[in-house]
Amino acid sequence: MGNNVVVLGTQWGDEGKGKIVDLLTERAKYVVRYQGGHNAGHTLVINGEKTVLHLIPSGILRDNVTSIIGNGVVLSPAALMKEMKELEDRGIPVRERLLLSEACPLILDYHVALDVAREKARGAKAIGTTGRGIGPAYEDKVARRGLRVGDLFDKATFAEKLKEVLEYHNFQLVNFYKVEAVDYQKVLDDVMAIADVLTSMVVDVSDLLDQARKRGDFIMFEGAQGTLLDIDHGTYPYVTSSNTTAGGVATGSGIGPRYVDYVLGIIKAYSTRVGAGPFPTELFDDIGEFLCKKGNEFGATTGRRRRTGWLDAVAVRRAVQINSLSGFCLTKLDVLDGLEEVKICVAYRMPDGREVTTTPMAADDWEGIEPIYETMPGWSESTFGVKERSGLPQAALNYIKRIEEVTGVPIDIISTGPDRTETMILRDPFDA
């Protein structure tokens, strides 16, 4: 039996992690975010009511769950307070259910200003960030000049540190990017107004998780974005600024790596990507448009239209390697309903004619890749809301089986709709 389960994306994000975390937290005591920031967009549908979470873990809707934001997360105080208010207005007692690590780096106004200015300066070469200050906040962390939640306990020292770091960043903004400086007093006043709320939720996350583990409590670690956006293993530089892979769980929460029992990879039945970067199976035809519209492929955070394409098993196999996946959860199978045929990319043809079954590491090496497909019959029957494997069309079952064969990983959960009830749990990760 596995007490500690990781849920992460195996593609370029937007795989449907939030719903699955919410579903599985029925048995969890703790849900932990360990990387990313409010650039994530996790959509939950419960009894027809939609909730979109960006920063707060998806376990927050459960009264039996304590939600934790770990040290690997860059935390925007403004975004957190906005999200807390939205939930509290619906009667959810967020402050009773949410805890923070004091080591979370803070995202402040100057990080957002830098993010936006840089993307604008890149012009046609823009990475396609969410413009929410994520990258600049991680830069400050690595440069050891970042402000953290724990700094708010000493407000006078915080003010001094803020003045120093803001002078540094305003020099860049004014002299290099030719934009207005960020006002020191406004940033300070905004943070001080909510400092006590933030510090009241601070705990020693590593110790809390270790004590929970020793008691045998079930813990779930909720990933954001996807494996192929990992800062080290993704399609660099078209990546996010954190480790979205299983390795980020230990460093981003403080739990020991040996205590992770099961890693669940969320895999969409087709591929999507937001922003710039390599995407070998991208479709520019009517099928691509069909997938976008039927799958409602618009970002929960930015509203941007997602690029769509066939399932890329080559890219997913890289995610299997990096994350040592225990099993898959297949999502959005119902979006493929009605297609005469479905395709899986099983290899790449490189510009020099070679066939390869692993992904390149550098973004430039993806140029000119041609996907090699296996084509399978589609199905006309609806899979939407089907809750038993026996209720799926044979062609859909064949597609599922082939995914398992080409990736070497079993599909333990199948999602056939946005509601938590529209799910088949073939093997519960907490029982694996």
From Swiss-Prot:
The cofactor note reads: Binds 1 Mg(2+) ion per subunit.
Q: Name one GO cellular component term.
A: cytoplasm
Binding residues for Mg(2+), per the UniProt record?
A: D14, G41
What coarse category fits the chief subcellular location reported for this protein?
A: cytoplasm
Give any GO molecular function from the UniProt entry.
magnesium ion binding
Q: Where in the cell is it found?
A: Cytoplasm
Pfam families, alphabetically? Adenylsucc_synt
Q: Which residues bind GTP?
A: 13-19, 41-43, 306, 332-334, 415-417
The alphabetical list of record keywords is: Cytoplasm, GTP-binding, Ligase, Magnesium, Metal-binding, Nucleotide-binding, Purine biosynthesis
Question: Which sites bind IMP?
Answer: D14, E15, G16, K17, N39, A40, G41, H42, T130, R144, Q225, T240, R304
According to UniProt, the reaction catalysed is: IMP + L-aspartate + GTP = N(6)-(1,2-dicarboxyethyl)-AMP + GDP + phosphate + 2 H(+)
**Protein EC:** 6.3.4.4
Q: According to the UniProt entry, where is the signal peptide?
A: none
Its quaternary structure? Homodimer.
**Name by which UniProt lists this protein:** Adenylosuccinate synthetase
Instruction: Kindly list the organism's lineage.
Output: Bacteria, Pseudomonadati, Pseudomonadota, Gammaproteobacteria, Enterobacterales
